[in-house]
Amino acid sequence: MSRINFSSPREAARAFTPKLSQFVDSTLYPLIWSDPALSPRDRSLITVAALIAAGHSEELPAHLRRAAGNGVTQDELAAAITHLAFYVGFPGAITASAIANATFSETENN
């Protein structure tokens, strides 16, 4: 059996649980992310904070890139991670810092 190399957890989930992915695609993005009560920038910052707080580092690179695309600066993300350290713990913040550094270093090198 050949090994499939997925570039993201979402891609792997799409292959294994297509109905879950369809639900996310039909609900999360059209209904939640498009609600005008919060800007995409604010939603991205909230999402990054939630992922860090919950320890879901596997989704963090994609959402860090999305946050940058939605106008959150690297300095703002660094400040948010530092702020979170005092509320959700230093290990999670340190892991998030390392992931952010790798994510943005990779982006700058491409």
What is each stretch, according to the model?
Residues 41-42, 59, 72, 88, ...:
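Residues at the start of alpha-helices and the adjacent loop-to-helix junctions
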